[in-house]
Amino acid sequence: MGITRQAYYQAEKRAQMTAQATEQILELVMEYRCLMPSIGTRKLYWLIKGKLLQRGLKCGRDQLFKILKEHNLLICPKRRYTKTTDSKHWMKKHPNLLKDYSAVQANEVFVSDITYVESAEGVHYLSLVTDAYTRQIKGYKLSNDMHAENVVQALHMAMQHVTDRATRMIHHSDRGSQYCSELYQSALRHYGVCPSMTDGGLAKQCFSYQNALAERINGILKQEFLITRCQTMKELDHLIAESIMIYNCYRPHLSLNMNTPNQTYEQTKTELIA
């Protein structure tokens, strides 16, 4: 059966309009993918939906998923774990203060962890300190080893950014030798921060779960931002600094009602000062 000339031109026009709309949608997608190369579809949709409305474009999350799939732009999650914790040492381990405890404001609980990153020069170690309530990365240090002095520098950076704090401030980490060291513990005492650590004994299989937030932030940074292979450690350090800025400013979190870490902090800052 044939179709009328009018029906043909109408179909042609619809296809053309769809192609133009798709082009605009992909343009918005690439704006954010340039900042956050591996951000997933759900968060991407949240970021662009306001701009879609401004342009009069109708596109739901399922439609965005379809468009990304057609253009080979879906992100496949990566899972890789490398142990960086050495808990078999003689130094004092502190109890877990976060059992049945959740932060209710910014600068109340900081979580710390060490992860490995690579450049063409070899393997390096990245120490991070994150605010458990806002998900802000507050401090970091890139180094060639896991010595305590490097981890302490990440803590110093984090505490420099604390202008208003909870009455009781907790620092939570695994039981690694760096965090148990006298150097690190004396730094916590200097800042008046209570140490908290993952459990040992029968609970040792649950280390990862007990410091899950810190390890989750490691994963986000490595899997969504640090995907370009840098030639030197210095170049990698610049990339990390830039990535942390973008993460804090632009990356929404489901756990924060799709707000960014910085937005969450700004929302709570008035309460902290009051």
What do the predicted segments below correspond to?
Residues 1-15, 37, 239-257:
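K/E-rich alpha-helical interaction surfaces of small helical-bundle regulatory domains
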Residues 189-191, 219-274:
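C-terminal domain-tail junction helix/linker
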